[in-house]
């Protein structure tokens, strides 16, 4: 089963502001969500975590030590919707994650 990756306007703007190398790294990591968007502890498949933010279930993906993507998974539509991508420090400040 393959999921479509959809980026919000904010996520697209963040990507557009990155240098070419950083944008490539972020895109490569987001593409991995096409096959497996859910966290799989111990699998070595990236730093993903299920979160509850403002009563909504969403997921977090650390990309390197620089960026964090927040996304929701819609199984019935086979979609991963990337809600936001932010600098990792901003993610920690805003959401209080370690």
Kindly give the residue locations of the regions a language model identified.
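Arg/Lys-rich, positively charged N-terminal/basic patches that mediate binding to nucleic acids
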Residues: 1-31
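Alpha-helical interaction segments
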Residues: 4, 28, 49-51, 60-62, ...
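Generic structural signal for secondary-structure transition and capping sites
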Residues: 23, 35-39, 90
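A short, surface-exposed loop/turn module that caps and links secondary-structure elements
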Residues: 32-62
